UniProtKB/Swiss-Prot annotation:
Its main location: cytoplasm. Belongs to the DapA family. This is 4-hydroxy-tetrahydrodipicolinate synthase. Pathway: Amino-acid biosynthesis; L-lysine biosynthesis via DAP pathway; (S)-tetrahydrodipicolinate from L-aspartate: step 3/4. The record marks 45, 108 as: Part of a proton relay during catalysis. Homotetramer; dimer of dimers. Keywords: Amino-acid biosynthesis, Cytoplasm, Diaminopimelate biosynthesis, Lyase, Lysine biosynthesis, Schiff base. It catalyses: L-aspartate 4-semialdehyde + pyruvate = (2S,4S)-4-hydroxy-2,3,4,5-tetrahydrodipicolinate + H2O + H(+).
Length: 302
């Protein structure tokens, strides 16, 4: 299965007692599929992977693979701070039914570019899944440079990159590396339309947890090269782009999901959305219902 279009980085629903809410998880998965998403990420940073036990990771991924049943690709977040642990987690994800591993640069340890290259080559060689590189320097403390990516794209098991940096020059440098076997995916909702109009294959999104159809519509327009229509739709979604970054991810998007009946909060050290931002969450959650309906109608008419 190819990677393109709208791919949701799923939030993990918890119940009032803080345990996994598997009923909410299954409802979220089905809502995403109904909204037209073209891929799903389980247990990434938006999914609070760092707060999950091994058993919970297994449960989420196994349930997702079973429910999705091959309708769209399932990517598992497997990146950890050490290479051996990342390889083991990637093998674990393969056994649980993931089709791809989303492998973030090792957090906190700040390897050199040579170290990053060696790390990703080892995971690609030994992990047992196709690897999507993930660069998000604001979270990890290190930046996977395009020239290093250029040295990795020839590996048959390295199939793409999720790039969270939004600078046009960074996007252009990565898009120049794309091929039939290597895709570039935006990891930033706010700049994704520009990235796709510039040649990126899609978006791994946070806000699409709450608005799968609306972000599918954005991706369709941008990937089709409909510049004016994509810009107009992007402007319509700009409040959601901005809101989902108003506090640490996934705090804001989980506030939207909670208002839609999916989940009841976060795990420490993350706290619920601050009181100052609750009115915006109320308004945007209400507006999302109409926006999703409009998106579905427009996609049917297209």
């Amino acid at each position: 299965m190819s990677l393109s279009g709208i791919i949701t980085a799923l939030a993990t629903p918890f119940g009032p007692d803080g345990a996994l809410d598997l009923d909410a998880w299954r409802r979220l998965l089905e809502q995403q599929l109904h909204g037209g998403v073209q891929g799903l990420v389980v247990a990434g940073s938006t999914g609070e992977a760092a707060a999950l036990s091994d058993d919970e990771y297994d449960t989420l991924l196994r349930a997702a693979a079973a429910q999705v049943a091959g309708r769209v690709p399932v990517l598992a977040g497997t990146g950890l701070s050490g290479t051996a642990k990342t390889i083991a987690q990637t093998r674990r994800a393969a056994a649980l039914g993931a089709q791809y591993a989303l492998v973030v640069t090792p957090p906190y340890v700040r390897p050199t570019q040579a170290g990053l290259k060696a790390h990703f080559l080892a995971v690609a060689d030994e992990g047992g899944l196709p690897v999507v590189l993930y660069n998000v320097p604001g979270r990890t403390g290190c930046d996977l440079l395009p020239e290093t990516v250029a040295e990795l794209v020839g590996h048959p098991n390295i199939v793409g990159i999720k790039e969270a940096r939004s600078e046009p020059e960074r996007v252009a440098a990565l898009v120049a590396l794309r091929s039939d076997s290597f895709v570039v995916l935006s990891g930033d909702d706010g700049s994704a339309a520009h990235a796709m109009l510039s040649g990126a294959a899609g978006l791994i999104s946070v806000a699409s947890n709450a608005l799968p159809a609306a972000y599918r519509r954005l991706c369709d327009l941008a990937r089709d090269g409909q510049r004016d229509a994509a810009a107009a739709w992007d402007a319509r979604l700009s409040e959601y782009h901005n809101f989902c970054g108003i506090e640490s991810n996934p705090i804001p998007v989980k506030a939207l999901l909670q208002r839609a009946g999916i989940g009841h909060g976060l795990r420490l050290p993350l706290l619920p959305l601050s009181a100052a931002h609750q009115p915006a969450a109320d308004r945007l959650a209400a507006d999302a219902i109409a926006l999703e309906a409009l998106s579905s109608r427009e996609m049917l008419a297209a």
